[in-house]
């Protein structure tokens, strides 16, 4: 899928274009959609959620991620904010796959600080 940001418009999304692409994808049998809070300048989850919310929820799967880019998001509180925001932006009661973004970067020490010590792995496993 091409970048749905409108040319020369900052952070505006061509929602009509996103809707068209999602409708066409679903019609052709695509049922898995992967996104992240950081995609499309931070607007991907919202645009995808808007497009998919027009279809029955049992017809597709959503994958999104907990970001690993900004250390300011590593606390449990910030991680939970990111987690909850994904549900809101995606307009869904459940997310099929909650992935951990960029796990290998920084090695095990960074992984431990980002996902283990703040309890997010335990939370996601529940």
What are these regions (language model features)?
Residues 1, 36-38, 65-69, 100-103:
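Active-site beta-loop-alpha junctions enriched in small/polar residues
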Residues 1-60:
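N-terminal binding-site loop/beta-alpha segment at the start of enzyme catalytic domains
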Residues 6, 36, 67, 108-112:
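Conserved short-loop catalytic and cofactor-binding motifs
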Residues 10, 73-126:
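Glycine/proline-rich, positively charged
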Residues 19-24, 60-62, 89-92, 125-126:
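Short, surface-exposed, polar/charged, turn-prone segments marking secondary-structure boundaries
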Residues 31-32, 59-65, 94-99:
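Structural preference for beta-strand elements that scaffold enzyme active sites
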Residues 44, 71-74:
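Secondary-structure boundary/capping motif
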Residues 50-55, 71, 88-91:
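Short, charge-rich binding segments
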